[in-house]
């Protein structure tokens, strides 16, 4: 299996845009790529206009192999969203099964989590870290550039190391057009914690798909991309 799990140090750090950028870069590089979103909250009522991260990823990245999982209307943590919907969370076996079903020989399968690494995604308090552990998959961590990011990032990396889950590196999800001293210093400090694979421009998720492809295609080291397979 060639599965890469993508998490974030916090909500709103740019995880979905980073997933789309990586999927786009892989596609441009000629890699067969699929994207899974096992658990999505905030989808709104049926037929409404709630969040749909996979639709946004497909629009930006030009990727068709999109695999949705369990969806809940309220924009809450999965446990709370499932409770409010009167619905069950998936079991560990169901989570693992959907990801394995999406994967294929020669394919890179990206798995975007919901929230951070230790957010409960499934029954019996199953987290994204548990999923990565069972799949023996590395984890790419999307981070913020501003104050507080060093502590948040270090805690996430420490949590991965505690279960011997390899970190595939960091992506800065929204690099400002005019970074201040904090952002510049933090970028250097983040690189000492783990390799920074990309620093995506703030607002890149709002550009046209053509511009998104141009930016994404050069955001990641092609040798690193090829090594994900």
Curated annotation (Swiss-Prot):
GO molecular function: ATP binding; dethiobiotin synthase activity; magnesium ion binding
One BP annotation, GO: biotin biosynthetic process
Residues that bind ATP: 12-17, 53, 112-115, 201-203
Binding, Mg(2+): 16, 53, 112
GO cellular component annotations of the record: cytosol
Pfam families, alphabetized: AAA_26
Cofactor: Mg(2+)
Listed EC numbers: 6.3.3.3
Pathway: Cofactor biosynthesis; biotin biosynthesis; biotin from 7,8-diaminononanoate: step 1/2
Keywords for this protein: ATP-binding, Biotin biosynthesis, Cytoplasm, Ligase, Magnesium, Metal-binding, Nucleotide-binding
ATP-binding listed as a keyword: yes
Leader sequence segment: none
Catalytic activity field: (7R,8S)-7,8-diammoniononanoate + CO2 + ATP = (4R,5S)-dethiobiotin + ADP + phosphate + 3 H(+)
InterPro entries on file: DTB_synth_BioD (IPR004472), P-loop_NTPase (IPR027417)
Locations listed in the record: Cytoplasm
Catalytic residue positions: 37
Positions with a binding annotation for substrate: 41
The UniProt record lists the keyword Ion transport: no
Family: Belongs to the dethiobiotin synthetase family.
Record's subunit section: Homodimer.
Function (record text): Catalyzes a mechanistically unusual reaction, the ATP-dependent insertion of CO2 between the N7 and N8 nitrogen atoms of 7,8-diaminopelargonic acid (DAPA, also called 7,8-diammoniononanoate) to form a ureido ring.
The protein, known as: ATP-dependent dethiobiotin synthetase BioD
Organism annotation: Mycobacterium sp. (strain JLS)
């Amino acid at each position: 299996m060639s599965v890469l799990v993508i998490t974030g140090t916090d909500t709103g750090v740019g995880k979905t845009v980073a997933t789309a950028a990586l999927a786009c870069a892989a596609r441009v590089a000629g890699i067969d790529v699929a994207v899974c979103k096992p658990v999505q909250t905030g989808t709104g009522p049926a037929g409404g206009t709630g969040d749909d991260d996979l639709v946004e990823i497909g629009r930006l990245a030009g990727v068709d192999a999109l695999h949705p999982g369990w969806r809940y209307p309220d924009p809450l943590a999965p446990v709370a969203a499932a409770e409010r919907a009167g619905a069950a969370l998936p079991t560990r076996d169901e989570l693992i099964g959907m990801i394995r079903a999406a994967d294929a020989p020669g394919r890179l399968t990206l798995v975007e989590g919901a929230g951070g690494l230790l957010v409960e995604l499934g029954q019996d308090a199953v987290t994204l870290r548990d999923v990565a552990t069972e799949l023996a998959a590395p984890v790419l961590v999307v981070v913020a550039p501003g104050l507080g990011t060093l502590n948040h990032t270090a805690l996430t990396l420490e949590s991965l190391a505690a279960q011997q889950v390899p970190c595939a590196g960091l992506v800065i999800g929204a690099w400002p057009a005019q970074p201040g001293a904090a952002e510049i210093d933090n970028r250097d400090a983040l690189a000492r914690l783990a390799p920074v694979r990309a620093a995506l421009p703030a607002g890149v998720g709002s550009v046209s798909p053509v511009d998104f492809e141009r930016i994404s295609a050069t955001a990641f080291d092609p040798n690193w991309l090829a090594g994900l397979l």
